[in-house]
Amino acid sequence: MVPSERGDVATAIRPAAADKLVHGPISDKKCRKKVPRKVHKSEREKLKRGHLNDLFGELGNMLEADRQSNGKACILTDTTRILRDLLSQVKSLRQENSTLQNESNYVTMERNELQDENGALRSEISDLQNELRMRATGSPGWGHGATGSPLPVPPSPGTVFPSQQPMQPSPMTTSTVFPLQQPLPQPTVIEPSARQPLELKLFLEAPPAEDPEPSEDQEAPNNVARPQPRYPTEASSWPISLGLPRMEDEQM
């Protein structure tokens, strides 16, 4: 019987404790907090729409100030088109940048090679200059002879070498000149490259030989022999039979 009474008491106590636990702290919290100002959802939506409209207006003015239609759809299509163009330009610029970087690297390599070659050439030039100075100091006559010796003067085109002078004929020789007679070979002379061309004389011009006029005092040489008579002799008129024995008698 005791446990049943205890159960009834517990059931009797529980609703009162539950009321204290439930209503006590909730009522305290409500009293402590201030009631906030309520903003309607429609007002918040209006504020958002106004802010978006301002942003679209600024974007439209940045893209095209004198636009016929300021609709949001037109502004969005224009912005997407411009963004695509900008992206394509960025891509092409990146490719150009890569090619230019490769070319710049190649140019720097060539410049370094040219600088090395230039240094090598300068060293060779300095070595050659030192060698020339040593030779000039070692043999002074060599340097003066190389610089002070006059260059050979080329002869004028009208000059005639001794070997090319025509031979004057003697008074006893005839004055005939053969047309096929060639001049004697010319001596080889080393001349600079700026020499004037010499005229090649194929035929020797001989002065006309004047026949010496015989003087009256001098007589012409009498070398002409008298002609022999060609009349038939007595022996030629003889017959052959008579002539042979006579020839044999003469031989005896």
Curated annotation (Swiss-Prot):
GO terms for cellular component: nucleus. Its main location: nucleus. The keyword DNA-binding applies. It is found in: Nucleus. GO terms for molecular function: DNA binding; protein dimerization activity. Residues 208-219 have a biased composition (Acidic residues). This is Protein IRON-RELATED TRANSCRIPTION FACTOR 3. It comes from Oryza sativa subsp. japonica.
